[in-house]
Amino acid sequence: MSRPRTIPDSDVFAAILRLIAEEGEKAVAFSSVARATGLSAPSLVQRYGALPQMIHSALLHEWTRIEATTATAMAEAAKGPQALLKALTNPPSPAMLAASLRDAALRDRARAWRQRVEVALAGRGDKDAAAMLFAAWQGQALWDGISDKGFKMKDAIKRLS
């Protein structure tokens, strides 16, 4: 009989996502995840099999979380693109998006999420304006940690609506 897992997968996945966000995907190794979680590297190998599967599982788990929070935000947000973007408080990080692009299934999840958000942003309006608004929102997220906040999303919404 196997021992009970003392550290849930969600905690392991959070550590993997932190490593990806802070140091890049190459920083994820059984040893670095072991240090971050307190599990032994052999325990991680036993749990996930191989490194690519462990990373894939973490990214898949994160896409499931993002899709659920997006559905909640869409259901609860007031009408209009600005309200929706404010409600989407935890979009995928640029590092997570980059890591997802290397895997066909994750790339499909990212594409479907983007399309879903763009449709919600467009409402009955212009689909091209919604695509530009989505791109501006993601671009802002990309540069948020690097530069000061000179760009205001609400100004883009006014111009594109």
Walk through the language-model features, giving the residues of each.
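Alpha-helical DNA-contacting segments of helix-turn-helix folds
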Residues: 54-62, 109
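An amphipathic alpha-helix signature
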Residues: 115-122
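Solvent-exposed, amphipathic alpha-helical segments
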Residues: 11, 15-23, 69-76, 96-99, ...
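Amphipathic alpha-helical segments used for helix-helix packing
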Residues: 82-114
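Hydrophobic/aromatic-rich alpha-helical bundle segments in the mid-to-C-terminal region
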Residues: 107, 111, 123-161
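N-terminal intrinsically disordered/low-complexity leader segments
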Residues: 1-6
